[in-house]
Amino acid sequence: MSESAGKTRRAAEVAANVAGATERRRVQSIREPLSPGAYVEYSVDDQPGVVERARAYLAGAPCEPVAPRRAATVMLVSEGKPHYRRFESPLAGGAPIEETVDAAPVDVFMLRRASTMAFTPDAVVFPGGGMDARDVECAVPWAGPSPEQWARLMSCTEPEARGIITAAAREVFEESGVLLASAPGGAAPIDERGAHWACEREAVATRQISFGEFLRERGLVLRSDLMRLRSHWVTPESEARRYDTYFFLARLPEGQHADGRTSEAVEAAWIAPGEALMRFDAGLLKLVPPTISNLTSIVAATSVDEAWNTPFDGHVRPHPVARACGEVVLGCEVSET
C-alpha cells in the first residue's frame, strides 16, 4: 500500500470512528465477557508508547504494518489450590502478597515475566509463545480433533492450525512442565517430575529437538482434545511488534504438576481469575488487555467444567480509535471468523 493510500485509509477510519460513535451498539469493555458481534473498546493509557503510536497511525504517519507472528497461549486451569497461591509483586516493593485462605472453585496457572524481556516485561501472563517453524513442519503424533477440524474452528489453514496447536502444547511443556499428551489410547497419568523429563524439557526449550521428535521418542501422542479454544487476539497495525495469538483453555492433567522453571519468568503461581483482576485493580500485578479479557471470560465459573464450557469469545482484531473527546483507545467489533 502506498503512503498516500495509507493516509487516506486512516483518515477515513478516524472520520468513521468519530462520526459513528453515537450510532454504534453498546460499547463493551474488556472487563465484560466478549462474544462475536460485540463492539469493544479499551484504554491503553497505562502504555504511553502504545498511545503515541496509535495517534501517529491515525494521523497518517508513514507506516507499513508488519506481519503478525502466529502465537499460542494456554490458560491452564485446576480446582482451587490455596496453598500454591502466592505472587511477589514488583509493583509492591517485592513483598509477598497475602495468601487467600479459602480455595476458589477455579485457579489458573500464571507466570510473571522477567523485567529483562523485550515484550511485556514484568507482566503476569499465561504460558505461551510464538509458533516455531518445526511446529508446522515436523510430524507430530496426534490424538483428538484433527488439524482440519481445528482449522474450521480457528478460521485458518490446516497447516496453521496444526502448528498453532503444537505450539500451544510445546509452550505449556516448556514453561510449566505440564504435558498435554499421553500414550495412544490415553493410558495411565504421566508423572513428569523425574530428572529425565527435566532434561528432555530443556532439550525442547533450547530447540535441540522438536516437540514432535520428543513425543515420538517417548511413544506419546499430542492430545488436542485436552484444549479448548477461548479467543483470538491480533496486535493492532500501529504496533511494530505484532502477534496473532490464539488463547486456549486446558485442564491440568491428572497426576501432573505445574511449575515456573523457565528463563522467561521469575515466578509462577496458581491464582483465582478474580483474585488476579483484583490485584491488577490494586496496582499489585501488571496485566495486558488480552489477559484481562480472558480472565474475565472465566471469572464467574464455579467449576473447572463450567470454565471449560464457556463459549468462544471470538476473534478480536483491535485498531486505534479516536473518540470525540480526543482520547485515543483501541477497539473493534468482535468477529465470528
Name these PLM-found stretches.
Residues 2-337:
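N-terminal leader/linker segments that precede catalytic domains of diphosphate-processing enzymes
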